[in-house]
Amino acid sequence: MQREALTGNLVITTVAGLVMGRVGKLQRVFLEEAVAAADVVFYDECDRVQKNLDDLFTPATEFNMFINECAEPVSQFMLETNTRRLGNLASAYYAELQAKSPTVLQCVSNAVKAAKNSENGSVLANTFSAYTLLDSIVDEISEATVKEIYRLMDFQTAEMSSLFDIMSRSCESIRSDRFEQLLAEWLDRREPQLKNNEKKIAVRKKIQLIITLIFFDRFVMEIGTAYEDSQDVTMGYNELVGFIRTRFTAQQDYLPSALMGNLFGIKLTSEDDILLFRQYAYGRALLTDLPYLRVNKEGVPIGPHVVLLSGSSYAKGSYEYHVNADVNYIVEADRSVREFIGNTQFMELGLAERVSGSPLENRDAVLRDVVDRCTAYIISELSDKKGKILLVVNSFSQAETVADRLRANFVKRGCREEVCALISDKNIEKKDFSQYIRRGEVYKFDQKKARILVAPALAIERGHNIVDEQGHSSLSSVFFLIRPMGVPDDVKERSIKMNGYMASKLFEYKENDLYQKNLYVRQEATKFWNRMNYSAKRRLDYLCDKEIKRDLVSTMFVLILQIFGRLCRVTDASKETPTVYFADGAFRKKIDAEDGFDALNEMYDYLKDMLSDEEHGEIARTLYEPFFTAYEGGIRHE
């Protein structure tokens, strides 16, 4: 395969294959070969490719996943004879670090929570690092203390810091009394104004957290080094080591750096885990700027030509999916297909139950209530139509919850139809594949006896088509049991949105001075990152930032459109037209609220504005007018 990639006239690959694949005897990164030798690069579904490129250069991993992965190899190591363990000290040290990891995670989590509780968590509500925390208190402590902490952060000078031995005790045990005592004594000498001052407790707790985070950063790096030194391959290769080892060195030679610099940070998850993430580069440049990533001596671009293909990449305002490139050609669907789509029935069920936005601990219960309310409509659809039905949720676990509830409801009503839940390709536990289908095999759903598929929005929006032997969609109806939106505080998604925001700004940027442009990028990216952090704390009903709100609405539209596209694979326009049900009550604002986030109304306004735009409306009308015609006819709008 590697030889063919170098000699073939046509190479078909994935995003990861293009960026990270290696070819030839020298194992050269395939991206280098493509930039140097390819005449043209076609990107299919370029809006999704754009998102995947940004995602690829923002690796993230949960520390507890590393701990879970360590369980078996560490157990095997402990079952060895002492002679065998002594025979490979490098592997023994790696095992020591692995075994110590649960204690370190508990200590870091406790330090984060202690700092959060002392100041209502404003700085710690989102992503943070030792640097950002120190910056937040720099005006409240002496310059000498700031310099001492910076000395501790620097790997070259850390051991010369008077805080080094104290830091070494920070994650020694979950009983942190000794560490806290030593640090308190140090602070009493250096920062007497903090002593016995109730108003300064938050500052002391932040310093304690900063010292703990510095230790944690060193500990994570030490794990990577220990793995490299270990010669025992049975100790395993895991996600954390992959996270540490990933440098994208060759790729960064071509790409602009991350917009805020090579960002590194951590985040405390809802399960008290620590999420680590980095952003290495501006990934979408490989999509929109590939011809300019290789130039001759005169500065003329000589990189590959690029053809971008997608039916949903023109969605202004969506920082994930809108591709900031001029549209040169539109392949318009046949009139009969446009009419078929325009005759779709859109219906909202008007349920009071609100799945999206409900407390996590109650969400499954609310989802089951929605399934109960929808069961009669589902049975009616099965009776009235020959096609199959898609039920859309937000996760694989929700898919199982819905499938189980619907099966139980069918039994009560004497309905013999079968229900199939989509599961991850990584899931190895499910055995009864009459009730489950893997994501990578979803195209086979047409061959299954089951007429109902329950699937997460992000798992079903793209990829394999579910069609009959004639290529016509097997699906005739879709029920949105949830409001399809991303996770508000997902750091990878936030990085993608930041890239998209700046791409939209730079598309219209006219300043030629490179220094001023770079300064503008850093400043605007940082401001927008902070805006996202601030908006993430607010409920949608109270979201005031118009650009972030428009991004949410436009991105939701693209997701709904792509899922709807599963029903619009049309080869026979005489067949039954699709029906789309909005079941989640959260698609509308609360009944008793004068103001609030009304997703269906917001989406109507967004589409109407885009289609009526004087300059680019023709593009939007060609792509989306059939959808809008059907939507406008079935959904109430104000």
Regions found by a protein language model. Name each.
Residues 504-544, 554, 582-638:
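N-terminal targeting/trafficking signals and adjacent low-complexity tails
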Residues 2-7, 13-223, 278-279, 301, ...:
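Signature of the SF2 helicase/ATPase Hel1-core->accessory helical subdomain module
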Residues 381-407:
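Conserved strand-helix element at the start of the C-terminal RecA-like helicase core
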Residues 368-384, 440-445, 570:
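Short, basic/hydrophobic alpha-helical segments
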Residues 446-447, 457-459, 500-503, 538-551:
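Long insertion/accessory domains within large nucleic-acid-processing enzymes
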Residues 2-11, 415-455, 466-469:
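Conserved motor-coupling elements within RecA-like helicase/translocase cores
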Residues 2-37, 49-53, 237-300, 453-456:
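Conserved helicase/translocase P-loop NTPase motor core
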Residues 278, 334-373:
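Glycine-rich phosphate-binding "P-loop"
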